[in-house]
Amino acid sequence: MSQEFAHLSVLLEETVGGLNIKDDGIYIDGTFGRGGHSRQVLQRLGEKGRLIAIDRDPQAIEAAKQFADDPRFQIVHGGFGQLADYVEDLGLVGKIDGVLLDLGVSSPQLDDAERGFSFLRDGPLDMRMDNSQGETAAQWLARAEIEDMAWVFKTYGEEKNARHIARCIAADRDKTPFLRTKDLADLIARITKNKERNKHPATRVFQAIRIYINSELDQIDQALEGALTVLAPQGRLSIISFHSLEDRIVKRFIRRHSQGESVPHGLPITEDQINKSRKLRAIGKAIMPSDEEIERNARARSSVLRIAERLDY
């Protein structure tokens, strides 16, 4: 792998440590990326351990060849939202000792201009995690209604000027279609009046389009529910989020399944019955990167790690 596209795994020790790895355990790395977390898991596993990695990026599948000679490792080409299906196909439901998810876009994806994720590098306006299938960002921007664009920018990017930006895109695309990342980034920079300090005006819109094109939040919901299904008792969830939308989903999921079922007041149900409906317990508080890690890797700044454990059935 070229140095240009090298990837530093965020919160590496904390995330893998949170899995509480057993020598003979079976683990899932749902976001293989370039293999940083997988490498750490394999180093801690014994000979009878097993690691199932998942990624929908063809470049990640290619990078997984570095572990081709390790019989404990296998890679699945697909989205982590379908992890329960993959585990069921392998006959391992209820036997998984840990699931690791490193959400969002990876550094190699951001740094490769041809992938179209970054407003700082000019490239095709693509943004697909799996660039072998599905609609590109350019194709969506060419056909989307103003209302739809505004909703995406507001919902997934928390963009205050969502409607104004959507209108300007619609007005400009009739003259010149948005085919390059620079085209879109330059338009947003030009029409944004109240710019945030130390943040490019296109940041939120690019995030929103990426999340929408890849159905990222739906994938997270599906992965969390799937993990709950496949985890063994005392199995661990170790999840890194990079923005508030992701972290909110993870935080609420852990809280909901840690509190047990909510029942109307007055129903004849015992505390023991409520306890039995609890499926998870949070392990400690949310973990943030240290100042030293942020200094080494600026992209770690917004990361949040949450760890939870599957309770007995």
Curated annotation (Swiss-Prot):
Catalytic reactions of this protein: cytidine(1402) in 16S rRNA + S-adenosyl-L-methionine = N(4)-methylcytidine(1402) in 16S rRNA + S-adenosyl-L-homocysteine + H(+)
Ranges in coiled-coil conformation: none
Localisation per UniProt entry: Cytoplasm
GO cellular component: cytoplasm
Chief localisation class: cytoplasm
Entry binding sites for S-adenosyl-L-methionine: 35-37, 55, 80, 102, 109
Short name of one Pfam family: Methyltransf_5
GO terms under biological process: rRNA base methylation
Record EC number: 2.1.1.199
Record-linked HAMAP family: 16SrRNA_methyltr_H
Purpose: Specifically methylates the N4 position of cytidine in position 1402 (C1402) of 16S rRNA.
Family that this chain belongs to: Belongs to the methyltransferase superfamily. RsmH family.
Protein name from the UniProt record: Ribosomal RNA small subunit methyltransferase H
Gene responsible for this protein: rsmH
